[in-house]
Amino acid sequence: MSIYNPKSLKAEEFINHEEILETIEYAEKNKRNVELIDSILNKARPQKTEHGVHCEGLTHREASVLLACDIPEKVEEMYKLANEIKQAFYGNRIVMFAPLYLSNYCVNGCVYCPYHMKNKHIKRIKLTQDQIRDEVIALQDMGHKRLAIEAGEDPVHNSIEYILESIKTIYSIQHKNGAIRRVNVNIAATTVENYRKLKEAGIGTYILFQETYNKESYLELHPTGPKHDYDYHTEAMDRAMEGGIDDVGLGVLFGLEGYQYEFAGLMMHAEHLEAVHGVGPHTISVPRVKHADDIDPEAFDNSLADDIFEKIAACIRIAVPYTGMIISTRESQEVREKMLHLGVSQISGASRTSVGGYTEEERPHDSEQFDVSDQRTLDEVVNWLMELGYIPSFCTACYREGRTGDRFMSLCKTGQIQNCCHPNALMTLCEYLVDYASEDTKKIGFELIEKELNKIPNAKAQQIARDNVDAIKSSNRRDFRF
């Protein structure tokens, strides 16, 4: 029997099955222990310091107790705390991005994904570089600046060379005032050498969903293909960081396994990255199993109700206060709105989850990875966020100013990142409004920018931001940043 060790590089030790089961038992035993719950909540509260703000975060056991808690007033207190922590680290900014699917060729047999190799219904597509150019121009014409590229695992069709060439193509395209300034990458677990190549290509965050942390379930859900190797997949983030990638993104596909198990495993993975590399996950994604071609979410026994889903989001924010939390267009407008109040800091907008989908007038369903619930345009999403009091941010400055990895975390964990992110969000929002927004969205947006500029505490920084906003409005000058 292996022993739990967050500093180990062996998957069975840093994601330890026995420790997860003991954690779930401990949480169940203490789910109405008010004294313990209060002490956990107090530990997690933001504390002001001479350098800004400090948040302790929680261990996987402490976080699991909060998740298990079913005392209504304590759950409400958790939700308020999650929002308070989100405000302390990220303010009212919401980072915008879009996925770009390059290829749905795949050699794996994942039973929850329509790209699995046995699916004969789905239309297999791999974009050429010219087609990628067309997709990127379509995304730029919406106003997007940040992409997450996606591809199935196929060493022939989707080689690392193809991925690298695609990244180079994406960064090279500047259409009108458009530009993609950050490319995040969501591809299969690979080698240290290949992660070095991705680093050299200038990627932002490397994202890899664990799918499930339960090894027995994992092997059943991935019966064939290279992804069947649980250890290789689970240890991928360590290889990525060894390869020089500063920012990594975690996530599980909720609904495949019991949510208590997945939550504990996710928290342990975050603790492991902190223990070994001194840097926790840059992002955590919270997708749920959704309907797609050849996939019925009702076939899985662990589907997640909205109230549990919301509670998970709040507990992640409280436990890992510095992480960027992502929710995609898998979820409806109503669910996404609730999640914004519980700690989500990044959302996708106007997403197409099919290969080549952005250049199609009609949403192509025959190559989608999952059905999109929120089908609004980017302008509608931006308008909606501003009506709710949020600042839609298209900023990518940290990545290009070297604020990544431990440098980003040192600023984020003290709340000092707001000194850069707040004005940068306003300037990139101004770019969006001038270049892409509808008249109604412009009106709301410029009023919001003026109100938010007045909140910048440093007089010099406020004046620089004002001057830059004026320059964006009156010229084609773009890409100002702190």
Protein language model features and the residues they cover:
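Canonical Radical SAM [4Fe-4S] cluster-binding loop centered on the CxxxCxxC motif
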Residues: Y90-G91, V95-Q131
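Core AdoMet radical
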Residues: M117-D134, A138-A240, D246-L256, G278-S285, ...
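Short glycine-enriched, charge-decorated loop/helix-capping segments at active-site entrances
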Residues: L221-K227, E298-N302, S367
